[in-house]
Every structure is written in C-alpha cells, then in structure tokens.
Amino acid sequence: MREIVHLQTGQCGNQIGAAFWQTISGEHGLDGSGVYNGTSDLQLERMNVYFNEASGNKYVPRAVLVDLEPGTMDAVRAGPFGELFRPDNFVFGQSGAGNNWAKGHYTEGAELVDNVVDVVRREAEGCDCLQGFQITHSLGGGTGAGMGTLLISKIREEFPDRMMATFSVVPSPKVSDTVVEPYNATLSVHQLVEHSDETFCIDNEALYDICMRTLKLSNPSYGDLNHLVSAVMSGVTTCLRFPGQLNSDLRKLAVNMVPFPRLHFFMVGFAPLTSRGAYSFRAVSVPELTQQMFDPKNMMAASDFRNGRYLTCSAIFRGKVSMKEVEDQMRNIQSKNQSYFVEWIPNNIQTALCSIPPRGLKMSSTFIGNSTSIQELFKRVGDQFTAMFRRKAFLHWYTGEGMDEMEFTEAESNMNDLVSEYQQYQDASISEGEEEYAEEEIMEGEE
C-alpha cells in the first residue's frame, strides 16, 4: 500500500496535526489509544496509508512530532489522543526558537534535525511502498517555519523521488502573532517554492472570518480554527485514505493540479461549514455544496479568487452522492464563471467521490484550487517584508545566528518572481501567437 509519513513541527504544526489525527482516527473507527472498533470494512481497507498496525488490533499513526521546546508536545501527550502516538516519535529540544527563523533553520533546529531524520528514516523503512510525506507547520514562527523548511530540504535530499506535501499556515494581517512574521514567512516561501511539491495554504485571517461570519462564533479560539483546518485536511486526504477513483495518491493530485512546477500553492475550502458543537440538522444537496464550495467566503486563504483565475481545481465529494449530479454541477459552475478559469487548460476541474462522509454529516465537499489570486497573499507578506527590511529592522536577531543579509534579498526576489509568474499566467490568453486557434475557440463558445 502507498503509505504517507506525517510530520508536524512547531506549536502551530503540532496543534493542527493533533486535530487532524483526532479527526481521521474517528473516521477510521479508532479510539483514543488506537484500538479499532469501527463498523465498516472500508475503514480498514486503506488504513495503512496513515497507520501502522501494531500488535493487539492497535493502530499507530505514521507521525513524527517535532518541536524545539517541550510545551506543545506535553499538551498533545496529555490530550485525548495522546496515547495514539508512538513515544519514540516525539523529538524535541529544550531551548525553543523564539519565533526566530534563523534559530530554527541554522542553529537550534540544525542540532536537532538529524535526530528527526533518523526517526523519519525508521518510519519510512516500515513502509511497503512509501508515496511521500506531509508536513503541518506555520510560516510565521521559528520552529515550524525555520526548522520545518530545513526538514523538508533534508528529506528531499534523502528521498528525492517521493512527494512532499505541506499544510502551511500563512501569517495574516489581522491575526499577527509576532512582529517578525513577514521575515519568517518570506524566508519560508523561498524554501517551499524550491522543495515542496504541493502546498495547501491556510490563513488564520480567513479562518477567523469563517468562524465569525459563517459559524457566528463571537470570539473563536485556536481550537475552533484547528477544527476547520482538520476538516479540510481530512477532506483533502480522503482520496488517499479511502478507495476512490480520482486523485488516489499525492502524485496524481499533483499531476492534476500543478501546471508549472513553481506554482504549487493551493487554496482550500470546505462545505458545509459547521461549528464544533453543532452539526447541521438540515440535509444539504449537491448544488448547495457546490455553491458553498466555490464561495469566496468559504476559502481558507485570505485571497479572493475573483481577482484572479483558476489554473486548475479539484473537488472531492463525500457521502451518498450521484456521480451525474456532481458532473452536471461542475459543468454548470464552469460555464457560468468562464472568466474565472484559464481557457488554455480545458477540463481543468477534477472531481472525486468517496462514499464515506465525515462524522456527523450526510455529505460534504472539499475544494482544492490552484488560483492565480493566491499572489495577493504573497504580495501582502512581501510588502510587509519590504517595509521592515528597507530599514533593516530586527535584522540583528537573524544575523546574530549567522545569517547573511544576502539571503533576505534572495528570498524577497524569489517571492516577487513567484508573484509575477502568477500574474503572467493570469494574463495569458489562448490566442497569443496562435491566431488560427482563436477562431475555433470562438465557434465553440457560441454553441
């Protein structure tokens, strides 16, 4: 079976990771200590993508938990699913990275990274046929961003032909944790552009908006935000965990979603949105799900796709859904919103179906979009970066750990390049230099 090894780094990564494991354990019928008491063979069929079967009907996540300070991990260990994880797979330092990317990437993190790679290697050796890795982390801090990207490049070196997917929490303007977030995020994006195969961008601001606007929570906690993220992660990985036809592994997902190697940053969405306590008591239909899923308010990254165009997107429906109805809805969305899709990639919406819905819902859908409007997110971080870097504010924290200003300049220009690449494909039309094709295109459009 095609296994995936999961890594979670830093405080944010560990909290999201813990929520993810809690969600998928429930879906696969495992209790807090990994014992199976589910009802359906489908739960077991591809269990070993994410879980290792130990003795006594117990399943253990293929997860490696990493942090530069013990606090968050103690919390995970004390949580409801703390018994689930293999104790040897907790790798932590004592000093912390203090929100400093350089500490995570070059000094503190670099000391710990070999221990982590050893654990990862051991997990990989326990797999029949490893398909790749996924990592949860934030880009604004020290450990998840600095050490997380260091781990990604180390794993890349050792497993060059395996897929690398990241669930990356991007700093947002409204919900700022530290003042140096723009530095940490830009340095991280610089790494992700080169070393990751697919990055699912999650944005705290967008999550807050969803909690306040849609779920009507007056002051959402990180627990509420993580609940949303785990719903999306569960949806994105559905095709990997249950038998299905489309996007059944990380590589197929990437082949369908990434038209150019550097442009692998995805927006994600989920429908129906429910808050943690209250599951929706009304039935949802496929048209409603489709409508909600393509609604900008449902996107978990604070960029509005109406300001750009979709290169590709993928929709995953779960529950008892009719294939035909889904196809019709998708065609409908695409023909109504033609201007939001690039015309030079025909059939750029992929759909997948899985008959097992998430807990507490009859049906749900998850959306993954590769839209040029994600550049807004990088622009925003880039502008904040430039404002501080021009004055060399806070730089001494980084140079003190042995970093060079040159690296900042490179990261900045790499991110600017990324933004202009997105812009270039947003503006590209089918007719450039291909006049004879343009006429055919018009004919088809008139039918």
From Swiss-Prot:
Keywords: Antibiotic resistance, Cytoplasm, Cytoskeleton, GTP-binding, Magnesium, Metal-binding, Microtubule, Nucleotide-binding. It holds the Pfam family Tubulin_C. One of its GO terms (molecular function) is GTPase activity. The keyword GTP-binding applies. GO terms for cellular component: cytoplasm; cytoplasmic microtubule; microtubule; spindle microtubule; tubulin complex. GO terms for biological process: microtubule cytoskeleton organization; microtubule depolymerization; microtubule-based process; mitotic cell cycle; mitotic sister chromatid segregation; mitotic spindle disassembly; nuclear migration along microtubule; response to antibiotic. Mg(2+) binds at E69. InterPro entries: Beta-tubulin_BS, Beta_tubulin, Tub_FtsZ_C, Tubulin, Tubulin/FtsZ-like_C, Tubulin/FtsZ_2-layer-sand-dom, Tubulin/FtsZ_GTPase_sf, Tubulin_C. It is found in: Cytoplasm, Cytoskeleton. Its cofactor is Mg(2+). GTP binds at Q11, E69, S138, G142, T143, G144, N204, N226. The keyword Lipid metabolism does not apply. Changing N100I: Resistance to rhizoxin. Belongs to the tubulin family. E.nidulans has two beta-tubulin genes: benA and tubC; benA is expressed during vegetative growth. Dimer of alpha and beta chains. A typical microtubule is a hollow water-filled tube with an outer diameter of 25 nm and an inner diameter of 15 nM. Alpha-beta heterodimers associate head-to-tail to form protofilaments running lengthwise along the microtubule wall with the beta-tubulin subunit facing the microtubule plus end conferring a structural polarity. Microtubules usually have 13 protofilaments but different protofilament numbers can be found in some organisms and specialized cells. This is Tubulin beta-1 chain.
